[in-house]
Regions:
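DPxDG-like acidic metal-binding loop motif
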Residues: 1-12
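Short acidic/polar mixed-charge low-complexity motifs
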Residues: 3-5, 19-20, 135
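An extended, acidic
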Residues: 22-144
Length: 144
């Protein structure tokens, strides 16, 4: 968006503009900056838990780019990104999810198992990427 560079390899280190970074340590929803893709048309079950969750988040946002918002979780600019609708293709999000995992963040696929993703198939995904397991588990506690 503004010339920032986010890089990683499989050594568990994520660089933001050349500096080593880690996800945020915030573990209270009311203090968290959480991005949510609000497109929930035709998803009645998902609407219920999302509305309950949004009541607990002080700073819900949506920038319009799942990859950027997921990458922001890895570098500590955001505490979580929630993609409720399974409409992201592998190449839309896999790089950013790699950043979150490399940085020590938390990822939960909502419609698939992350270990069974076949990059050659045209699957679509929904997921929660969080800065830590505490925030991730709090978010998932709203999903029934």
């Amino acid at each position: 968006v503004n010339g920032d560079r986010i890089l990683s390899n499989d050594n568990g280190k994520v660089l933001f503009n050349g500096n080593s970074v880690k996800p945020s340590s915030t573990n209270i929803l009311d203090d968290a900056y959480i991005s949510v893709n609000m497109r929930i048309r035709d998803m009645d079950n998902e609407k219920k838990w999302l509305i309950s969750l949004l009541r607990e988040i002080r700073y819900p946002r949506f920038l319009g780019s799942a990859a950027l918002e997921t990458a922001y979780v890895a570098v500590g600019k955001s505490n979580a990104f929630i993609q409720i609708i399974p409409n992201l293709r592998t190449f839309d999000c896999i790089g950013a999810l790699f950043l979150v995992k490399s940085a020590g963040g938390w990822i939960e696929f909502l419609n698939n198992d992350i270990d069974n993703v076949d990059l050659r198939k045209p699957e679509r995904f929904s997921y929660v990427a969080a800065s830590n397991s505490t925030i991730g588990d709090l978010i998932m506690s709203f999903r029934t």
